[in-house]
């Protein structure tokens, strides 16, 4: 009889002593015992160390020392993990009751790389649930799934070997989960992702959480991820230049992701951004760049409807002196 699957749960932590006890309690209250709890603290100066010491008998490994941020902490935790299934949860979020038992019941490692369930959002206290109850959605193609920008990371568990092969990109401090998810999709597609209707986590919103205080930084990093995807698809410079407008970081260096899924899976993403770029270049009167983006949209199956024909006439049939 095979051994029961082991879950590794990593908590990256920094000055969240106020919320950490509840996070730890949500894990040790699970009705499945074959798990390990790894806490990587970035040298907290609040009550975090006292909390960790209080729960030390339930913690497999912990360390408190300065690090380079959340992504680095997850990377350090991954080096300590020995489980078959791995996820991280922030030090202010909660694992839902029964989550571990459900995950091992449905996670067939021969069939799946990823299992994702629902995530409830709540404001400050678990008694104050937000209206959102979300699960990562899979669309008909990888490109359409990417356009939805939804992962619900606390409720997304990876097969350990897959997580290790992908790793966590330390360049991202806010969207490391989006980067991880998109790199996975580009390599493996969606066929080995299992969506379950089970509630796996609670995501806390509060006045000092990154989600509440750093929205512009989230968007800037998300723009880098999307740029990397299109860069990896070898899209023309005109489209990449449009994408780079949303990236404020002057030192941004693009990363080429490994792409193994068929081209047709990614056409919805390319044509959607090509059309956005077309509108932008029309507004800025850059006709040559607009033409390039119009071709990209059509090459990626933008439908031959009224919207496309208007743009085609504008750029290929009417003389430029007649255009505004």
What positions do the PLM features span?
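Conserved donor NDP-sugar-binding/catalytic core segment of glycosyltransferases
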Residues: 94, 98-130
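Conserved nucleotide-sugar donor-binding catalytic segment
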Residues: 133-228, 237
């Amino acid at each position: 009889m095979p051994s029961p699957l082991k879950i590794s749960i990593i908590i990256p932590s920094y000055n969240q002593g106020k919320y950490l006890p509840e996070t730890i309690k949500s894990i040790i209250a699970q009705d499945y015992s074959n798990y390990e709890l790894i806490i990587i603290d970035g040298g907290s100066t609040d009550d975090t160390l006292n909390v960790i010491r209080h729960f030390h008998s339930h913690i497999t490994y912990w360390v408190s020392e300065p690090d380079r941020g959340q992504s680095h902490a997850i990377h350090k935790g991954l080096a300590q993990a020995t489980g078959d299934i791995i996820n991280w949860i922030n030090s202010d979020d909660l694992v839902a009751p029964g989550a571990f038992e459900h995950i091992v019941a449905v996670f067939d490692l021969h069939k799946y790389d990823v299992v994702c369930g629902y995530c409830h959002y709540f404001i400050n206290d678990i008694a104050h649930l937000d209206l959102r109850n979300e699960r990562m959605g899979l669309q008909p193609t990888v490109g359409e799934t990417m356009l939805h920008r939804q992962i619900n990371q606390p409720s997304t568990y990876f097969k350990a070997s897959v997580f290790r092969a992908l790793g966590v990109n330390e360049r991202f401090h806010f969207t490391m989960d989006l980067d991880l998810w998109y790199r996975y999709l580009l390599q493996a597609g969606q066929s080995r992702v299992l969506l379950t209707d089970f509630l796996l986590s609670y995501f806390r919103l509060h006045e000092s959480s990154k989600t509440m205080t750093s929205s512009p930084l989230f968007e800037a990093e998300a723009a880098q991820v999307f740029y990397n995807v299109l860069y990896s698809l070898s899209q023309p410079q005109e489209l990449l230049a449009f994408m780079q407008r949303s990236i404020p970081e002057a030192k941004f260096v693009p990363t080429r992701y490994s792409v193994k899924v068929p081209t047709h899976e990614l056409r919805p993403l390319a044509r959607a951004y090509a059309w956005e770029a077309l509108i932008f270049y029309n507004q800025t009167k850059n006709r040559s760049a607009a033409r390039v983006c119009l071709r990209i949209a059509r090459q990626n199956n933008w439908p031959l409807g009224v919207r496309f024909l208007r743009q085609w006439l504008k750029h290929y049939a009417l003389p430029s002196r007649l255009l505004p």
